[in-house]
C-alpha cells in the first residue's frame, strides 16, 4: 500500500520512484536547488506521521498548504489546516514546524508536517507537496546527504546516525549515539592537527634549516609527536575488532558432548524454541544460528552438534561443522552434564576443547570460554560427584532455570570484555573503512620514521594526514559516499 501511495506522490512531481533505493545517477546532487520531500516516520497506520521537506521552496510549500498563510514562529509547533493547493480541499489539521536554514538538520530551509497517520491523509499530503513547483520526492538518504554536504554532519557522524537507526541492542545504541555526537570525528581531527604541527616543523627545517633564528629541536619535537600518535593509532587498531563485533554481533557458540543440554540452553537464552530438544543423542545435526540480545549486547548464538566420534556420515558432517564454528567463535559456551562428568565423552571434551582454549592467553587469542555444568537439579546437595578436576565453572539447570541469573551476569562481563564498554571506553572503530584509514595513516608514519630525505618525510606526513581527513569525509569520493548513504531510506 505505502509503495503505491509514494508512487502517486512521485508521479505528481517527476515520475515514479521506489520508496527505498540507491541514489540514481540522474538524481540532482545535494545543493542543486531542488526542494525535496518525504515521509520520514515509519510505514503503516500510526497515530502521527511526519512528512518533511528540505530546500529553498520549503517556506513557499508551507504557505500554500496551510491557513493562515504566514510562516509560523521558527522551531515552534503551530496547529494549521492543510489544504490541497490545486482544489482547496482540506487534507488534515496538523502541527507544522518551520526550520529556517542554516539552523536545521540539513542546513537548508526545512518544514515538518506532523499529520494523522492514516494512509489517506499521508497520501493526500504527499500528492499535494508533489504538485508544488520546485518540489520532488527525496532519494534514499538525501536529507542526511544534504546535511553532510552543508557541513552539519561529518562522515563518521553520518555513519553513527545510520548505526543508530539500525541499532537493536542497548550497547549498539550507546556506541552509535557517541559516534553521532562526533567523538570519533573529534579524535581524528585532533590527530590531524598533531600531524599538521609536525609537518610544519619539518617544512620549517627544510626551508630555514640553516637560519640561526630557527628554534632548536624542531625535528626532535616532530619526532616526539609522531611517536605519540603511532602509539595511539596502534591502540585503536588493536581494538578495531571490538567495534566491529559491537556493530555486527558477537559470535557465541554453544558446544559440548551429546545430550549436555546445548539446545535447551539456546532456547533459554533466545527465549523461543529455536532448537529441537530430545533425550535422544545426536538430535542436532547442523548448526542453528539465531540473533539475540544478551545483556544489551548483539549476539549471534550458534547451537551445534554434540562432539563425538564413530557416528554416521550425516552426524559426522554436523560434528565437522561444529568444530569449524568453534574456530570462528568469539565466545564459547562449553556445556557438560553435571551428573555425568566421569564419562569418557565429558573427560575427552574437558581435555581437548576446554583445556586448549583455557591454555591460550588473551594476547594470543580473542576467544573466551565459559564452562557451564547443566542439569544441576540432578545433583545431590554436595555438588558434582567424582570426576576430573574442573576449571572455574557455573552450575545451571535449564529445566528449572536455577543458575540462569549467574550465567547471564557472567555473559555480560564476557561480552563487555569482547566488545568494550560503549559508555566509557574510547571511541571504537565500527567499520572496515575506519580501520583502513587508520592503518594507512600508521603505515605512512612508519615511512616517515624510515625516510632519510626530509622532503620524503614531509610527504609521508601529508599522506598520513590525508587518511585522517578522508576518514571524517574530507576529500571523499562519490563512490564511497554512495556506499555509506545506501544504508538510509527515503525521509532520512
From Swiss-Prot:
Protein name: 5-taurinomethyluridine-[tRNA] synthase subunit GTPB3, mitochondrial
Family from the record: Belongs to the TRAFAC class TrmE-Era-EngA-EngB-Septin-like GTPase superfamily. TrmE GTPase family.
One BP term from GO: mitochondrial tRNA wobble uridine modification
Domain TrmE-type G: 249-416
InterPro entries: G_TrmE, GTP-bd, GTP-bd_TrmE_N, GTPase_MnmE, MnmE_dom2, MnmE_helical, P-loop_NTPase, Small_GTP-bd
Known outcome of mutating residue 322 to P: Strong decrease in GTPase catalytic efficiency
Organism, scientific name: Homo sapiens
Cofactor(s) the protein requires to work: K(+)
Tissue: Ubiquitously expressed.
Gene Ontology cellular component annotations, sorted alphabetically: cytoplasm; mitochondrion; nucleus; transferase complex
Binding-site positions, 5,10-methylenetetrahydrofolate: 52, 112, 152, 492
Predominant cellular place of this UniProt entry's protein: mitochondrion
MF-aspect GO terms: GTP binding; GTPase activity; tRNA 5-taurinomethyluridine synthase activity
Residues at which K(+) binds: 259
Amino acid at each position: 500500500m505505502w509503495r503505491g501511495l509514494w508512487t502517486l506522490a512521485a508521479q505528481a512531481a517527476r515520475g515514479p520512484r521506489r520508496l527505498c533505493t540507491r541514489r540514481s545517477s540522474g538524481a540532482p546532487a545535494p545543493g542543486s536547488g531542488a526542494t525535496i520531500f518525504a515521509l520520514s516516520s515509519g510505514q503503516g497506520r500510526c497515530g502521527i506521521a511526519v512528512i518533511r521537506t528540505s530546500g529553498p521552496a520549503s517556506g513557499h510549500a508551507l504557505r500554500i498548504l496551510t491557513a493562515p498563510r504566514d510562516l509560523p514562529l521558527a522551531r515552534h509547533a503551530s496547529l494549521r489546516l492543510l489544504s490541497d493547493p490545486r482544489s482547496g480541499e482540506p487534507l488534515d489539521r496538523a502541527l507544522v514546524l518551520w526550520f529556517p536554514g542554516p539552523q536545521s538538520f540539513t542546513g537548508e530551509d526545512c518544514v515538518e508536517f506532523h499529520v494523522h497517520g492514516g494512509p489517506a491523509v499521508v497520501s493526500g499530503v504527499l500528492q499535494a507537496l508533489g504538485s508544488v513547483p520546485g518540489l520532488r520526492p527525496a532519494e534514499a538518504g538525501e536529507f542526511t546527504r544534504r546535511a553532510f554536504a552543508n557541513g552539519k554532519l561529518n562522515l563518521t557522524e553520518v555513519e553513527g546516525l545510520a548505526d543508530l537507526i539500525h541499532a537493536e541492542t542497548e550497547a549498539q545504541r550507546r556506541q552509535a549515539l557517541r559516534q553521532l555526537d562526533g567523538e570519533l570525528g573529534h579524535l581524528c581531527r585532533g590527530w590531524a592537527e598533531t600531524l599538521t604541527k609536525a609537518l610544519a616543523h619539518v617544512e620549517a627545517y627544510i626551508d630555514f634549516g640553516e637560519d640561526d633564528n630557527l628554534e632548536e629541536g624542531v625535528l626532535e619535537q616532530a619526532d616526539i609527536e609522531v611517536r605519540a600518535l603511532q602509539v595511539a593509532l596502534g591502540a585503536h587498531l588493536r581494538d578495531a575488532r571490538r567495534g566491529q563485533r559491537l556493530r555486527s554481533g558477537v559470535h557465541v557458540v554453544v558446544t559440548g558432548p551429546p545430550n549436555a543440554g546445548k539446545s535447551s540452553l539456546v532456547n533459554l537464552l533466545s527465549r523461543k524454541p529455536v532448537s529441537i530438544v530430545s533425550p535422544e543423542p545426536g538430535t542436532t545435526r547442523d548448526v542453528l544460528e539465531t540473533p539475540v540480545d544478551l545483556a544489551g549486547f548483539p549476539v549471534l548464538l550458534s547451537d551445534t552438534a554434540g562432539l563425538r566420534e564413530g557416528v554416521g556420515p550425516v552426524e559426522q558432517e554436523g560434528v565437522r561443522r561444529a568444530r569449524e564454528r568453534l574456530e570462528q567463535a568469539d565466545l564459547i559456551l562449553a556445556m557438560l552434564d553435571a551428573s555425568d562428568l566421569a564419562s569418557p565423552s565429558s573427560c575427552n571434551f574437558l581435555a581437548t576443547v576446554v583445556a586448549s582454549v583455557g591454555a591460550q592467553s588473551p594476547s594470543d587469542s580473542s576467544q573466551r570460554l565459559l564452562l557451564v555444568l547443566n542439569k544441576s537439579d540432578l545433583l545431590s546437595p554436595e555438588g558434582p560427584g567424582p570426576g576430573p578436576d574442573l576449571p572455574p565453572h557455573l552450575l545451571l539447570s535449564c529445566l528449572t532455570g536455577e543458575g540462569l541469573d549467574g550465567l547471564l551476569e557472567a555473559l555480560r562481563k564476557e561480552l563487555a570484555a569482547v566488545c568494550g564498554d560503549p559508555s566509557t571506553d574510547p571511541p571504537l572503530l565500527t567499520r572496515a573503512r575506519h580501520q583502513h584509514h587508520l592503518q594507512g595513516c600508521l603505515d605512512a608514519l612508519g615511512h616517515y620514521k624510515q625516510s632519510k630525505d626530509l622532503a620524503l618525510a614531509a610527504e609521508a606526513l601529508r599522506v598520513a594526514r590525508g587518511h585522517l581527513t578522508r576518514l571524517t569525509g574530507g576529500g571523499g569520493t562519490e563512490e564511497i559516499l554512495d556506499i555509506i548513504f545506501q544504508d538510509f531510506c527515503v525521509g532520512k
